């Protein structure tokens, strides 16, 4: 069985060498890194059953990329999409704009699914 959160974090960290932060875990007085990813696990839904036991779980994540370099926001997120598809994540579309709490940063997000087979 795969640790899906660790797969997400490690894949992004190894490729981009940027912080990968669980959404909401930064303190209010903590400075934003120049560029970073955040993620949030929306749901984990059992999807397939055999003999009254779940055999598949669908992990649903939001992945956001923030940067003080607006030109990188689209390109890095699309690179992350390709990378994550290569390790088994399902990614539909090219993303959406996300709000930033800092005027210096812009953000873009994508939705990820991962089917964990048990």
What is the role of each PLM region?
Residues 55-68, 105-116:
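Oligomerization/assembly interface segments of phage tail-like spikes and tubes
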Residues 52-58, 78-81:
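Short intrinsically disordered coil segments
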Residues 42-45, 56, 95:
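A generic structural signal for solvent-exposed, polar alpha-helical segments
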Residues 1-50, 71, 76, 102:
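Small/polar-rich, solvent-exposed N-terminal microdomains that initiate assembly or binding
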Residues 78-118:
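Acidic-leaning, charged glycine-interspersed low-complexity segments
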Residues 1, 30, 50, 55, ...:
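Compositionally biased, intrinsically disordered low-complexity segments enriched in polar/Pro/Gly
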Residues 52-54, 67-73, 92-97:
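Short C-terminal domain-edge/linker segments immediately following a structured domain
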């Amino acid at each position: 069985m795969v640790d899906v959160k660790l797969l997400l974090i490690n894949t992004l960290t190894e490729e981009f060498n940027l912080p990968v932060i669980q959404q909401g875990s930064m303190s209010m007085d903590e400075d934003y890194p120049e560029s970073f990813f955040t993620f949030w696990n929306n749901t984990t839904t059992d999807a397939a059953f055999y003999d009254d036991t779940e055999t598949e779980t669908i992990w649903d994540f939001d992945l956001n990329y923030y940067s003080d370099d607006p030109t990188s926001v689209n390109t890095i997120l699309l690179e992350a999409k390709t990378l994550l598809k290569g390790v088994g994540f399902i990614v539909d579309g090219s993303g959406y704009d996300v709000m930033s709490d800092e005027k210096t940063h812009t953000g873009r997000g994508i939705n990820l699914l991962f089917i964990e087979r048990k």
